[in-house]
Amino acid sequence: MAKDKTKKKNKTLKKIILAVVITLLGTLLIVAGVFLGKILKLRSDAKKIMSNVSLDSFRQTETSIIYDKNGKEISALSGIKELYYLESDEIPDVLKKMFVQIEDKDFYNHSGIDMSAIIRAALANVTHASIKQGASTITQQLAKNMFLDQSITWNRKITEMFIAMELEKRFSKDQILEFYINNIYFANGYYGIEAASEGYFG
């Protein structure tokens, strides 16, 4: 009699454990499905943003220079941005190296995102339950500055990563660095190193 009761208890316990395991697995699958769906949606959004991007997208608001018949500058008409665009070969190598050294030492080795930096930042952010530390590469910064807002959210960050990877597929490293240097905001309405030097130093 006692053995029968023990067997029944064991069977009941096994059923409870099995039910709990199935429930947990089901919950995990649902969460994983929702998460995957969200990631795929953000990836799709990034591709849509990039669908109409061309070389002109990075210089379309540059300042127009007006010259007289002798080639002397007589006026500068600002676009939406105060931006004087420099081609890659017009940007000093020392300046390029400086930006890479300061902003993204592995710029020439990654494909738009730096996974080791992302993992390091993710651990710090999870600890604080919010985005406290960034891991943005030069390409990601370009993606954010050109195509996204400045909000600090996971959605924006993930979209930024997808856009960065698309940029790396479409443009060379030299082009990306050129776009970046020409579109950095230096305050007072100046975008890019040339506009900043013209504005601050004349």
Predicted features and spans:
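Juxtamembrane regions of bacterial inner-membrane/periplasmic proteins
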Residues: 2-202
